[in-house]
């Protein structure tokens, strides 16, 4: 083993795919500190990859169960933007191919903006179909946020280029003639729902960044329409915009 240079050990470790590989045992016996560091790095990376694969397996349980029942085009549906004081509620619907594997995809609230953008790109590239539904503030005020979120989800499903034969929906039942399951906290339990949530959130965040150009004083590019201190101070100083939800407190007090 000592006949191998540290560079050679590093290159060889990059080829190792399984923890049962005898080369790892050789590395353990190598007295060189640099080799031990390389081994430790490999073990950490492998453990992380293993955990991500286990997470993926757990989060495809609903999809595998639906597939066993004979369903092939399974769409995950979720929304973003129920709580903000301004902006639309946006829904995403995604059909992922059975062979698709996007490791690390999970509840969008646990992912950084950078990671969400990365997953958004992968989903749009690898998905069999992606649909988006948008319901704006005036409709939210007219029919209430719950119904608006449901309407956005229906729009997202109808926007899919492939017609799904089964739906996995985050905590809601949709008025569609398609078999479906409502999954509580679905974006943490189903990869399809997590994909829908990612599409919804990134789409909405981008919309709010565009609105910020029209209404720069509210900080929409940062707060996404939520009631931050900056947003509330601007609301008090300038009043509500056309994208504010007039039935939401405290917006209604400035109307």
From Swiss-Prot:
InterPro entries with a match to the protein in the record: RNase_HII (IPR022898), RNase_HII/HIII (IPR001352), RNase_HII/HIII_dom (IPR024567), RNaseH-like_sf (IPR012337), RNaseH_sf (IPR036397)
Domain RNase H type-2 residues, every copy: 72-255
Binding site for a divalent metal cation: 78-79, 170
Top-level lineage group: Bacteria
Cofactor note as given: Manganese or magnesium. Binds 1 divalent metal ion per monomer in the absence of substrate. May bind a second metal ion after substrate binding.
Primary site of residence: cytoplasm
Function: Endonuclease that specifically degrades the RNA of RNA-DNA hybrids.
NCBIfam families per record: PRK00015.1-1, PRK00015.1-3
Similarity comment: Belongs to the RNase HII family.
Protein name according to UniProt: Ribonuclease HII
Species, as recorded: Bacillus velezensis (strain DSM 23117 / BGSC 10A6 / LMG 26770 / FZB42) (Bacillus amyloliquefaciens subsp. plantarum)
């Amino acid at each position: 083993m000592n006949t191998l240079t540290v560079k050679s050990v590093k290159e060889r470790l990059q080829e190792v795919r399984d923890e049962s590989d005898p080369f790892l045992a050789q590395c353990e016996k190598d007295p060189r500190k640099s080799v031990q560091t390389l081994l430790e790095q490999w073990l950490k990376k492998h453990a992380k990859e293993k955990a991500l694969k286990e997470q993926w397996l757990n989060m495809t349980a609903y999809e595998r169960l639906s597939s066993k029942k004979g369903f092939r085009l399974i769409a995950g549906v979720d929304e973003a933007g129920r709580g903000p004081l301004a902006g639309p509620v946006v829904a995403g619907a995604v059909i992922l191919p059975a062979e698709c594997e996007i490791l690390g995809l999970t509840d969008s609230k646990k992912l950084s903006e950078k990671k969400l953008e990365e997953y958004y790109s992968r989903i749009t590239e690898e998905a069999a179909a992606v649909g988006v539904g948008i319901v704006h503030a005036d409709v939210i005020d007219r029919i209430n946020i719950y119904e608006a979120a449901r309407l956005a989800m229906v729009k997202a499903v109808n926007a899919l280029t492939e017609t799904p034969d089964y739906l996995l929906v985050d905590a809601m039942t949709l008025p569609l003639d398609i078999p479906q399951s409502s999954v509580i906290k679905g974006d943490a339990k189903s990869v399809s729902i997590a994909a829908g949530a990612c599409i919804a959130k990134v789409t909405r965040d981008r919309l709010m960044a565009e609105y910020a150009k029209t209404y720069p004083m509210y900080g929409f590019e940062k707060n996404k329409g939520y009631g931050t201190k900056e947003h509330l101070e601007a609301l008090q100083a300038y009043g509500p915009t056309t994208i504010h939800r007039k039935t939401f407190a405290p917006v209604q007090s400035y109307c």
